[in-house]
Regions:
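Short S/T/G/P-rich N-terminal loop/turn motif that feeds into the first structured element of a domain
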Residues: 4-65, 73-75, 98-108
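N-terminal cationic-hydrophobic initiation segments that often serve targeting/anchoring roles
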Residues: 49, 82-86
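Short amphipathic alpha-helices within nucleic acid-binding modules
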Residues: 73-83
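Conserved short beta-strand edge segments in small beta-sheet-based binding/regulatory domains
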Residues: 88-100
């Protein structure tokens, strides 16, 4: 429920014309990591569509889970990226803000 509140709050009060940051919380099966391991870093970065950019990706290899931070002009770009892995990974996409943006929102 809290994640949906954050999404609604962000969509209502953030400047839509500005790029936003999204966190993709993912859990993948072993097949995904077999595919992932065959790719170069450039190939992985090239999966992000024009108008979006990977800021960071972190893996917990013991559980097959992790997060990706993506900056994007439109949420659809992040959804489209995540859908590319949907056969082998489950993902949850949540808009996130940094400390400065959080303080601006919370003090309105």
């Amino acid at each position: 429920m809290k994640k949906y509140f954050v999404l609604a709050f962000t969509l209502l009060f953030c400047n839509i014309s500005q790029a936003a940051v999204y966190m993709i919380d993912f859990k993948c099966d072993q097949e995904a990591y077999k595919v992932f391991a065959t790719m170069t870093l450039d190939e992985l970065d090239d999966q992000f569509l024009e108008g979006s950019k990977k800021l960071a990706r972190y893996h917990d290899l013991t559980t097959g889970s992790g997060i990706v931070l993506v900056e994007a002009d439109e949420p659809a770009l992040v959804i489209e990226f995540a859908n590319g892995w949907s056969e082998v990974c489950e993902s949850l996409i949540v808009p996130v803000v940094d400390d400065k943006e959080a303080m601006e929102i919370l003090t309105r």
